[in-house]
A protein has these predicted regions:
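N-terminal active-site beta-alpha-beta segment that forms phosphate/nucleotide-binding
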Residues: 1-80, 85-87, 91
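Conserved phosphate- and dinucleotide-binding cores of soluble alpha/beta proteins
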Residues: 50-161
Length: 161
């Protein structure tokens, strides 16, 4: 994975004052690291990821951090389930940065049922949705559909065109 390319392209899509949702994927965690080093002065970060919250705890107070709680999934190091979805339903998101287990010609997919449910809710509530996937995700298919490929405002990848 050329994650530097992914995180740089992702960071360029962020603007001052954005309300971001960052999912619990390792790909999006690279973007979170880049955002933590950036010069933004006003961002709100919403996440269900324990790793992302730990990263952003060191940021200045002008960053608003919102952690979605719920049932803890140790495999994904994140919170998922009905409580997480209910908390998300109360929030506005301007831009969501998401990843997937696989991306084929039709769909982005995952192997985690509750993660799929949360991502679908995030996409429905966000003004813009970005999928970050490294080249290893192409042609793979998971059990649960996140969304149609065309539902994303942009697919950010390190794959050569």
């Amino acid at each position: 994975c050329d994650c530097t390319k992914l995180e740089t392209r992702g960071t360029k899509l962020v603007a001052e004052g954005d309300i971001l949702f960052l999912d619990s994927s390792t790909t999006v965690a690279h973007l979170a690291e880049e955002l933590a080093r950036s010069s933004f002065t006003s961002l709100t970060v919403i996440t269900n990821s324990v790793a992302v919250m730990q990263l952003f705890r060191r940021l200045p107070a002008h960053y608003v951090r919102i952690a979605l709680g719920g049932a803890y999934d140790p495999q994904l190091n994140s919170f998922l389930g009905e409580t997480t979805v209910a908390q998300l339903a109360q929030l506005n998101v301007t831009k969501a940065f998401l990843s997937a287990f696989g991306l084929d010609d039709r769909n982005a997919t995952t192997n985690h049922e509750h993660q799929a449910e949360l991502i679908r809710k995030v996409m429905a509530s966000s003004e813009r949705n970005y999928l970050l996937v490294d080249r290893s995700k192409f042609g793979r298919t998971g059990l649960y559909r996140l969304s149609a490929r065309g539902a994303f405002d942009e697919i950010i990848t390190d794959r050569k065109a």
